[in-house]
């Protein structure tokens, strides 16, 4: 590989190397995706694919909250009840995955490395728009797997550009990689219809839309939504009261990214249950 093409353009006046495109670096090095374009899955007797659901996100008073349950299933089998579906890509970007964990985790790792490679080679962070399109391209590149009914991923992305757009933005995608800016909320996964219906009612008729709620109220709402989704969808874990397994919750504000610890989430849920007595 030839990396000798240095040029000016760094944020601090230093010289940068290459284009900063991580996918170009992989192509030049002869590295290819595990999911080859010519891959063909068996038409019958394919093994049950592990799936991860449900994830949701919405705008609240201070920024964007993004949450996911912890259950991963393969057909009617519960494979794992502590799956991490909400992943930090960098200090300003969060992805929540619904679909095949194997493909989604590979996408997340690729994006983490891509963002870091661009920042180090170009001496500046990748723009918000470029991050949004980078995920869309990975989803589109996964289309052969999606069309065969395996490896589908439909994620949610929360991100901000702290230099030009400090207010967090929320995006959802379709299976072809098209991205959409979510004004109020975004949901994905098999339990999403129930969560979507509740969020639509809250924002339209409750008189207390999500954008008016503080962080604690937003976290409590996310826990309620995932618990409601779990009532009608066996692939959604919700809140496991017996094992004390709680959903993942992260928030993205003007001040940056924050992961809520288990104890904070537990306190929010305990307060909810106490209010019902």
Predicted feature locations:
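Long, low-complexity N-terminal extensions
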Residues: 1-277
